[in-house]
Amino acid sequence: MANYLVNNLSRPLKIPIRIKYCDSFFSKLIGLMGHSEISENEGIALAQKTEDRIGSSIHMLFMRFDILAIWLNSHFIVVDLKIAKRWNPFYIPCVPARYVLEVHTSQKPHFFIGDKLIFEDI
């Protein structure tokens, strides 16, 4: 898995979020399930081959903590975001998405629909 720093070009973050990029079936299925928590500036990005609603849905089964789910289109524009509660079965974005960022809930004030994000190599 590759690592990236994610920043918001529309509202730059003081500290970019360090993410692990998950594009295999297994890495996306497991996601953050085995973690007891994540720090405020860490998360994962789940990548799909194309934009769609069902393929970019997430489940929260076996999760020990809530997350902020941020759905992005192919141009890294935020198209939806929700606080995903642990143990809720699943969340589906309102519109098709290609990427899902799963980050700490404290990041919610820093992201809005329409924001443009950037993934920078570490």
Located regions from the model:
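Compact, glycine-rich, soluble single-domain proteins
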Residues: 1-122
